């Protein structure tokens, strides 16, 4: 009698050499639960998605460069017999950072945010006085890995004018005040499988930088005993997301008197399986239960 295993595709990119990915750590636990796993570049054109029972979006870290093709791939998966995690509806909701304003309306504290669909140098320059800050952050509404993210200083704006116009002339973008605690303390990531908190880490930028991603020199530290107020904030955010998600990452920074939501990552976040030895098994078990 043949042992028919379930098959799972883990979506990635064809070249991870410039990235830090730890998704290989979930393969052994998944195999132990009866799954066959295969890493597949998301833009591969020769895949029959009906060959798989489940497809999990993982390290698809160039999708923002080919957004239409990315959606076409996900639509093909959802039209097949395979189940997509997280679902296409979740991706559509989460891919544009306009969702932050939706969460703010649900009483989630976010970094003050202004959204624009066209670039006007004078309007952006006026935001220094609007926010009463001398540093701002500007980034696309659809972005990943801190791509096309800039720190703006009022005294240096004129030097960046042509770069900003070239970068944002054809894309939606947001502007926020720069939160100093990103440099001094760092950014917290709370990682959930289902609605269960798995682990918490603190990501700090290298000296002279503001980006906390490892690819930019960021340093990771596991927080074994996170403050109860941080957990409460993360749980509150999770309770306002209008979908049930297999995996979620809530990125948070400490404000002057409370925590502020930076982003909710529901598409292809690094889940930092390397930072908690129990997390790969926990992920596999939650996934197996969800799919069962």
Model-predicted regions and their roles:
Residues 2, 6-12, 74-79, 88-185, ...:
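Active-site nucleotide/adenylate-binding loops and adjacent lid/helix of ATP-dependent enzymes
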Residues 41, 175-177, 245-256:
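A short glycine-rich, hydrophobically flanked beta-strand micro-motif that places a catalytic Asp/Glu
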Residues 52-57, 189-192, 258-270:
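A short beta-strand motif that forms the metal-chelation/ATP-contact edge
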Residues 60, 114, 141, 178-179, ...:
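Anionic group-transfer/hydrolysis microenvironments
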Residues 61, 146, 206-207, 265-275:
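Glycine-rich phosphate/pyrophosphate-binding beta-alpha loops
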Residues 242-245, 254-292:
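C-terminal active-site "lid" helix and adjoining low-complexity regulatory extension at the edge
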């Amino acid at each position: 009698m043949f042992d028919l295993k379930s098959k799972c595709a883990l979506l990635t990119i064809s070249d991870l050499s410039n990235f830090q990915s730890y998704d290989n750590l979930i393969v052994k636990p998944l195999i132990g639960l009866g799954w066959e796993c295969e890493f597949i570049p998301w833009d591969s054109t020769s895949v029959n998605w009906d060959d798989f029972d489940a497809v999990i979006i993982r390290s698809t870290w160039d999708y923002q460069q080919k957004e239409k093709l990315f959606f076409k791939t996900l639509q093909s998966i959802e039209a097949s017999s395979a189940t997509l995690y997280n679902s296409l509806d979740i991706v559509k909701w989460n891919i544009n950072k306009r969702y932050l304003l939706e969460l703010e309306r649900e009483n989630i504290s976010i970094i003050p945010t202004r959204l624009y669909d066209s670039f006007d140098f004078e309007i952006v320059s006026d935001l220094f006085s609007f926010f009463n800050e001398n540093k701002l952050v500007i980034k696309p509404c659809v972005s990943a890995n801190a791509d096309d993210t800039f720190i703006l200083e009022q005294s240096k704006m004129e030097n960046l004018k042509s770069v900003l116009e070239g970068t944002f002339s054809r894309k939606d973008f947001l502007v926020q005040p720069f939160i100093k605690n990103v440099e001094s303390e760092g950014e917290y990531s709370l990682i959930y499988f289902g609605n269960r908190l798995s682990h918490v880490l603190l990501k700090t930028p290298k000296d002279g930088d503001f980006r906390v991603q490892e690819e930019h020199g960021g340093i990771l530290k596991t927080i074994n005993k996170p403050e109860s107020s941080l957990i409460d904030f993360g749980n509150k955010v999770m309770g306002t997301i209008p979908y049930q998600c297999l995996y979620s990452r809530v990125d948070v920074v400490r404000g002057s008197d409370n925590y502020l939501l930076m982003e909710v990552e529901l598409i292809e976040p690094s889940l930092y399986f390397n930072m908690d030895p129990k997390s790969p098994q926990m992920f596999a078990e939650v996934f197996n239960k969800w799919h069962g």
